[in-house]
């Protein structure tokens, strides 16, 4: 189990300040934003869809947890480490083998670090594949599309720089003492809404998206009662 989990939880316990591990939550937020928009573009009904998360390290675990919190129809997970799978199953995910996941999932997200893990013949026609390992993905997006994927992207396209500036700015603007999962969802929805009609996510160089994330996170923190308005 990654040590970052324990470190983040301990910092949250000790500090009355917002704490966020970007490799976990920044990646999860941008991935959720991309999933929201790719479903819009491909006609997949997200709340009824089957999503498969391959690899449950820091990023993969956070992606699966946020997908569950958002209400994705079914979240399937697979990892060679049973200790990584157990917390996700307890949260509502279904544990499965890789081959079964690839056969059943409408949306496949990979964060394994294993180049070439997914073979072209394993891609199901109409599937969405986010192969996010850097610098080399589990399957090249062009190869996945040629094999029948409706959409495919790698880690360069799903950039967590879209998330963390606005999340922190939004939390700090209202003196929030912590960052709640609903604030991450608000950030993901703001990123998704900032994309163009034919985009899955906007450019991280867009100032508009960072302002939108800031406002969404601040408003969400206030609605949740997490804003420390006495200090504003």
Regions found by a protein language model. Give the residues of each.
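Glycine/serine-rich phosphate-binding loop and adjoining beta1-alpha1 elements at the start
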Residues: 1-49, 168, 172
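Predominant activation on well-ordered alpha-helical scaffold segments within soluble catalytic domains
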Residues: 5-12, 29-36, 64-65, 89, ...
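Gly-rich Lys/Arg/Thr-decorated short loops/hinges at beta-loop-alpha junctions or inter-strand turns
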Residues: 9-19, 46, 84-90, 104, ...
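Adenosine-phosphate binding glycine-rich loop
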Residues: 20-24, 42, 131-231
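Glycine-rich phosphate/diphosphate-binding loop of Rossmann-like nucleotide-binding domains
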Residues: 25-113
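Rossmann-like adenosine-cofactor binding region
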Residues: 91-152
């Amino acid at each position: 189990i990654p040590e970052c989990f324990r470190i983040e939880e301990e910092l949250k316990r000790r500090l009355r300040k917002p704490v966020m591990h970007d490799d976990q939550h920044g990646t999860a937020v941008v991935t959720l934003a991309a999933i929201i928009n790719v479903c819009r573009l491909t006609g997949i009904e997200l709340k009824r869809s089957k999503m498969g998360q391959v690899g449950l390290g820091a990023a993969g675990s956070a992606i699966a947890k946020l997908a569950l919190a958002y209400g994705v129809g079914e979240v399937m997970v697979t990892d060679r480490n049973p200790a990584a799978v157990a917390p996700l199953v307890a949260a509502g995910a279904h544990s499965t083998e890789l081959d079964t996941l690839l056969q059943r999932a409408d949306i496949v997200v990979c964060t394994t670090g294993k180049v070439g893990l997914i073979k072209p013949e394993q891609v199901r026609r109409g599937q969405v594949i986010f192969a996010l390992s850097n610098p080399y993905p589990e399957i090249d997006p062009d190869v996945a599309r040629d094999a029948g994927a409706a959409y495919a992207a790698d880690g360069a396209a799903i950039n967590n720089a879209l998330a963390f500036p606005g999340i922190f700015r939004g939390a700090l603007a209202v003196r929030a003492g912590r960052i709640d999962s609903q604030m991450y969802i608000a950030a993901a929805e703001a990123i998704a809404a900032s994309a163009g009609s034919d985009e899955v996510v906007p450019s991280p160089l867009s100032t508009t998206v960072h302002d939108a994330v800031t406002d969404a996170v601040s408003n969400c923190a206030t609605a949740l009662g997490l804003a420390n308005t006495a200090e504003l």
